[in-house]
Curated annotation (Swiss-Prot):
The keyword DNA-binding does not apply. Residues 1-314 are annotated as: ATP-binding. GO terms for biological process: response to antibiotic. InterPro entries: ATP_grasp_subdomain_1 (IPR013815), PEP-util_enz_mobile_dom (IPR008279), PEP_Utilizing_Enz (IPR051549), Phosphohistidine_dom_sf (IPR036637), PPDK_AMP/ATP-bd (IPR002192). This is Rifampicin phosphotransferase. It comes from Listeria monocytogenes serotype 4b (strain F2365). Changing residue 333 to W: Almost abolishes RIF-phosphorylation activity. Its EC number is 2.7.9.6. The lineage of its organism: Bacteria, Bacillati, Bacillota, Bacilli, Bacillales. The gene is rph.
Length: 867
């Protein structure tokens, strides 16, 4: 017999598909000792399906909905209204009504007032915060009224808002069903919401309570302001008493009314201090039962607290699991690497196996525990100053943690002996020989060539042994002392030039102009060479027309039928042979590479054809060289006019030569690493394909949700835990929606820092200046490079840019990113291309709207919206 009705105490764990998120959580709360839940039951999804199962019109309407996009508003509106009317006029089968009759007798009978709440299978789940998307009805009395409101709850599954939300979150309308919670109404003196973690800072030790008089609907619907109480370790740390002009109360005959409160009550504290602590303890008990922070709806009646809902807080950033005592401080690796997307487990594995630093995972990102470095003055000062140079927001976030009273242990009165020899100054590095860049590149290319040949013969467990060995070769290449010296030589020369030329001539960031068209930069070459691909295609209108409309991932093979198709295919293949291992978010080995989906490059190629004349790559590079040379001559001439000018000019010339020789090499080690990652990926996908053939894996790309050693064990044993893979897929869907903080504490507090600058234009949007100059233009807010339809002279506004974005830089005249630092990829390439750039602009992609006219000041570090 199918369970159409379940009392709360009868609901078992993992029953989302039967009772929805709300129903399952109420069932769990009903089983917690000392927690009062108003009596009630759940009309299950089986009742929903039974009522509508044989309705052909309903089935056809669902089929129509499944093909719609969020842009199809007229169709959504029409189908929404039709479905809701249909459901409300469909009679609930008598057998379901009979089960309800019997259950209602146990929870008070039809004469009792009830709350009728929808409980969707896609609502209140850990990976999708659907709260408030479906309807709730209060103080419903009588059988007919209950049945009517049950149908109205079912119909609320198909409001326009709910339909659009499902489309956005890729939920299948045909698979989402609705259960209905029917619960005794409490007529409370007060009600509200309790968060067992601070919803603003994510601090897990701070508990937040919102409270107002009457029913909670006034608070949830935004009709009234609420008192706000903060509790930490059973101590009230903050109280804000709101003016509560209104409250909603139940009516005896059913329904609710809104009342204006007496003046004396409007400013009265809703809960006493004793009640606040009592409720906080109750919240901690519920949190402990579920094992994660909770968003709890509560009400107070006759001196007792009742819980009417509890759901996980879906917006909190996870905390790294570190078995170390005391308070800890973690710094985001994502912000240093300019890639803040969530990574899949296999991608995390390879980065962890590549880096010598100890890192921890949280929310699909990597963090480093810097607590020890902050516990001694010398290492603390070095960290704050070095990181602060490249990213002032991280510096401010670190200072915020350091200044948190009692969070970090006090500095020792005498320095730790292990730090005694540290001067606080960066070590003096030797400048490599001028031929070293050529040798480093050649050695890396030879090493990659050997890897490609050797890995082809490896399979099974031997493949994993081979990859582990080759990762040591990768680390040898990446952390070669000569390579590091070459990178630092360019960076040190840049810093020296900026500091001394500002001191001597009063000119800021002169290294930006001097870096334009520097040689040996594999990433800027990548952008310019895509212009050469555009030159090959430009004379062939049939190819251009085909590329403008094709969505076929196999388009390369179709080119052969077109005039110029063979030439186009060869140009693309040559480009992909050199750069095809790159993509957005490329440090995650699991990301789709350009060579795996060449369609990604087509919008940029078409933009290049539209925006540039033939030969633009040579012209742009030569123009950059010319401007850098003229700036060099100007600086040297002005220096020679100063006291001791010949000496200053000689020193400056030496630094300019070092800058131009070495600054481009900085991009090469990552290019080599990504090359290797792609070779590993292809080999592991072959292993995944074999696992699918052997019936062990369902899909080849399921390997992405296993860590390297786990995948190695699956290959060795032929056994896999699919529940683990499915959990990680759900977790990843959650992690994708989270924004990682720059600094995270062991309390879960997210600290992102603030800019502290004065004398800027009113309403200026602050960021970090990384490439000098001021420019005005149309903002193009682009989050996906595949949609980069850029016009010559646009200003690119995006979340971050890694090397894969470089081809877009040839079309733009300015850059704004949410993440970045002085020496991160976007900054380096912007300087080489001569583009004014401001990075580290918090929420830039939401504050700035696509198409707005903006002005960016890459010298002072701010943006102005002009319209």
């Amino acid at each position: 017999m199918k369970p159409y009705v379940l009392k709360f105490q009868e609901i078992r764990p993992h029953s989302e598909a039967l009772v929805g998120g709300k129903g399952m959580n109420l069932g769990a709360c009903s089983n917690i000792e000392g927690v009062h839940v108003p009596a009630g039951f759940c009309l299950t999804t089986e009742a929903y399906k039974r009522t509508l199962a044989e309705n052909n019109e309903f089935t056809q309407l669902l089929q129509r909905l499944s093909s719609l996009k969020t842009s199809d508003m007229d169709a959504i509106r029409e189908i929404s209204e039709t479905i809701r009317t249909l459901i409300q006029h469909t009679q609930i089968p008598s057998e379901i009504a009979s089960y309800m009759d019997a259950t209602l007798l146990d929870v008070g009978g039809y004469e009792m007032p009830f709350a009728v709440r929808s409980s969707a299978t896609a609502e209140d789940l850990p990976h999708a915060s659907f709260a408030g998307q479906h309807d709730t009805y209060l103080n419903i009395i009588g059988k007919d009224a209950l049945l009517q409101h049950i149908s109205m709850c079912w119909a609320s599954l198909f409001t326009e808002r709910a339909i659009i939300y499902r489309i956005q979150n890729q939920f299948d309308h045909r698979k989402v069903q609705l259960a209905v919670v029917i619960q005794q109404m409490i007529s409370p003196e007060a009600s509200g919401i309790l968060f067992t973690a601070d919803p603003i800072t994510s601090n897990r030790k701070s508990l937040s309570i919102d409270a107002s008089f009457g029913l909670g609907e006034a608070l949830v619907s935004g009709l009234v302001s609420a008192d706000s109480y903060t509790v930490r370790e059973n101590t009230i740390t903050n109280k804000i008493i709101a003016t509560k002009k209104l409250a909603i109360y139940s009516l005896k005959e059913g329904g609710t009314e809104t009342r204006i409160l007496e003046k004396s009550q409007q400013t009265k504290q809703t809960l006493t201090d004793q009640q606040i602590i009592q409720l906080a303890k109750l919240g901690r008990k519920i949190e402990a039962y579920f094992g994660k922070p909770q968003d709890i709806e509560w009400c107070l009646a006759e001196g007792a607290f009742y819980i009417v809902q509890s759901r996980p807080i879906t917006t909190l950033y996870p905390i790294p699991e570190v078995n170390e005592p005391g308070n800890r401080v973690y710094i985001s690796v994502a912000h240093q690497q300019m890639m803040t997307d969530a990574m899949k487990p296999l991608g995390l594995s390879f980065y962890l196996m590549t880096t010598p630093a100890t890192m921890y995972t949280a929310g699909g990102r990597l963090f480093v525990d810097i607590t020890q470095s902050l516990s001694a003055k010398v290492s603390r000062d070095m960290m704050v100053n070095s990181l602060g140079q490249s990213d002032p927001l991280i510096k401010d976030a670190l200072l915020t943690v350091i200044n948190k009273k009692g969070f970090l242990p006090p500095l020792p009165t005498e320095e730790n002996p292990s730090h005694a020899t540290v001067s606080g100054k960066p070590p003096v590095r030797s400048i490599p020989d001028s031929s070293s860049v050529f040798e480093l590149v050649r050695n890396s290319e030879n090493s990659i060539k050997h890897l490609k040949q050797s890995i082809e013969t490896k399979s099974g467990s031997d493949l994993f042994d081979f990859i582990v060995e080759d990762l040591e070769e990768l680390k040898r290449v990446l952390f070669n002392p000569t390579s590091i010296d070459a990178i630092m030589a360019g960076m040190d020369a840049s810093a020296w030039l900026n500091e001394h030329i500002y001191q001597w001539l009063g000119e800021k960031n002169v290294a930006d102009k001097l870096s334009e068209s520097a040689p040996n930069n594999i990433t800027s070459q990548m952008g310019l060479e895509l212009l050469d691909v555009a030159d090959v295609i430009r004379p062939y209108p049939a190819v251009r027309a085909y590329l403008e409309q094709t969505k076929n991932p196999d388009f390369m093979n179709e080119l052969a039928t077109l005039e110029g198709g063979a030439e186009t295919k060869k140009a693309l293949e040559d480009y992909l042979q050199k750069y095809g291992m790159r993509c957005a978010g490329e440090i995650d080995l699991t990301k789709t590479r350009w060579i795996e989906n060449p369609l990604t490059l087509i919008p940029l190629i078409l933009s290049n054809i539209k925006n540039f004349d033939s030969g633009a790559s040579m012209h742009k590079f030569a123009q950059g060289e010319k401007e850098a040379f003229h700036k060099e001559q100007e600086i040297l001439r002005r220096l020679q006019e100063l006291p001791d000018g010949e000496q200053k000019a000689m020193e400056t010339k030496e630094k300019i030569d070092i800058l131009r020789h070495f600054i481009g090499y900085r991009e090469y080690p990552k290019y080599g690493m990504i090359n290797r990652y792609f070779i590993y990926k292809l080999a592991l996908l072959r292993a995944g394909e074999q696992l699918v053939k052997d019936g062990i894996l369902q899909e080849q790309e399921d390997i992405y949700f296993l860590y390297f050693e786990e995948l190695r064990e699956v290959v060795r044993t032929g056994q896999v835990d699919y529940e683990l893979i499915n959990v990680r897929k759900r977790d990843f869907a959650t992690f994708e929606k989270l924004t990682p903080p720059r600094i995270l504490t062991s309390d879960g507090e997210m600290i992102n820092g603030e800019y502290k600058r004065e004398n800027l234009p009113k309403d200026a949007i602050l960021g970090l200046p990384v490439s000098s100059g001021t420019v005005e233009g149309r903002a193009r807010v682009i989050l996906d490079m595949e949609k980069a339809d850029l016009e010559d002279g646009d200003i690119l506004v995006t979340a971050y840019t890694d090397p894969s974005w470089t081809p877009a830089f040839v079309s733009i005249k300015g850059l704004v990113t949410e993440v970045g630092g002085l020496m991160t990829h976007g900054a380096v390439i912007a300087r080489e291309y001569g583009l004014p750039a401001v990075v580290g602009v918090e929420n830039a992609t939401t504050i700035i709207k696509d198409g707005q006219q903006i002005r960016i000041n890459g010298t002072e570090g701010y943006i102005e919206i002009l319209d």
